[in-house]
């Protein structure tokens, strides 16, 4: 079982040049605006550190959070990176393209990133923007990195829709609108920060353990 010893906000950055120097393994959160990134980060870190804007897509900063976890008596300093939500940004196309270029450069050049957490709204699983992100991650993912796709807000699905998504994710090994993600670098999980002990959704305890294993390279033989 993973214990969260401490968590704190580190700093914000607009691009790679003014990001804090890497001093721990890093986990990056990507997802559309309002997909639940802030909620998931705060739940994982056991502290309300990530703030969500009332205007979707308004925040254009990369936020860094430091946390110390203990797993099997091993002390693990980790850095969690919250990227700006994509899809709803109310900015000009020129600014948006420049913003996306900086983010892609950050993801590609930041050698300390070990795990990408791609959050997808369980109610809207085949949006073009998520397909683009899935494709991009598959293209830039290095041999020492992994991708963990987390379907959020699964508690909002009715039983029939939940069963269908469960079958797609765990039995059919999940494809996101034609993008084959069934490889050693990618895994998908159903999660809800609200529902507890639901047999079709992973628990918070299990999710933390999966994050640790993927970050350390234990799940794909790194």
Swiss-Prot record:
Annotated function? Necessary for normal cell division and for the maintenance of normal septation.
GO annotations under biological process? division septum assembly
A GO molecular function held by the record: metal ion binding
Task: State the superkingdom.
Answer: Bacteria
Binding residues annotated for GTP, in chain numbering: 31-38, 57-61, 82-85, 152-155, 191-193
Q: Which cofactor does it need?
A: Mg(2+)
Per UniProt, Mg(2+) binds at 38, 59
Species name for this entry?
A: Helicobacter hepaticus (strain ATCC 51449 / 3B1)
Family, per entry: Belongs to the TRAFAC class TrmE-Era-EngA-EngB-Septin-like GTPase superfamily. EngB GTPase family.
Which GO terms of the cellular component aspect does the record hold?
cytosol
Check the record and name the PROSITE patterns matching this protein: G_ENGB
Q: Indicate the segments forming the EngB-type G domain, all copies.
A: 23-217
Q: Which UniProt keywords apply?
A: Cell cycle, Cell division, GTP-binding, Magnesium, Metal-binding, Nucleotide-binding, Septation
Q: Which InterPro entries match?
A: G_ENGB_dom, GTP-bd, GTP-bd_ribosome_bio_YsxC, P-loop_NTPase
Q: Which Gene3D superfamilies match?
A: P-loop containing nucleotide triphosphate hydrolases
Protein name (Swiss-Prot/TrEMBL): Probable GTP-binding protein EngB
């Amino acid at each position: 079982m993973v214990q969260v010893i401490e968590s704190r906000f580190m700093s914000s950055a607009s691009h790679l040049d003014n990001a804090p120097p890497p001093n721990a393994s890093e986990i990056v959160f990507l997802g559309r605006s309002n997909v639940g990134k802030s909620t998931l980060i705060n739940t994982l870190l056991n502290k309300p550190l990530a703030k969500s804007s009332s205007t979707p897509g308004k925040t254009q900063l990369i936020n860094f959070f430091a946390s110390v976890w203990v797993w099997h008596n091993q002390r693990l300093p980790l850095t969690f990176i919250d990227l700006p939500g994509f899809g709803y940004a109310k900015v000009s196309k020129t600014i948006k393209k420049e913003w996306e270029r900086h983010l892609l450069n950050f993801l590609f050049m930041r050698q300390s990133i070990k795990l990408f957490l791609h959050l997808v709204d369980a109610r809207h699983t085949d949006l073009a923007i998520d397909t683009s992100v899935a494709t991009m991650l598959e293209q830039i993912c290095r041999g020492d990195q992994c991708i963990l796709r987390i379907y959020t807000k699964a508690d909002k699905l009715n039983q029939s829709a939940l069963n269908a998504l469960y079958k797609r994710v765990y039995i059919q090994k999940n494809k996101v609108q034609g993008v084959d993600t069934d490889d050693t670098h990618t895994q998908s999980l159903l999660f809800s920060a609200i529902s507890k002990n639901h047999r079709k959704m992973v628990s918070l305890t299990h999710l933390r353990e999966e994050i640790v294993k993927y970050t350390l390279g234990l799940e794909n033989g790194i």
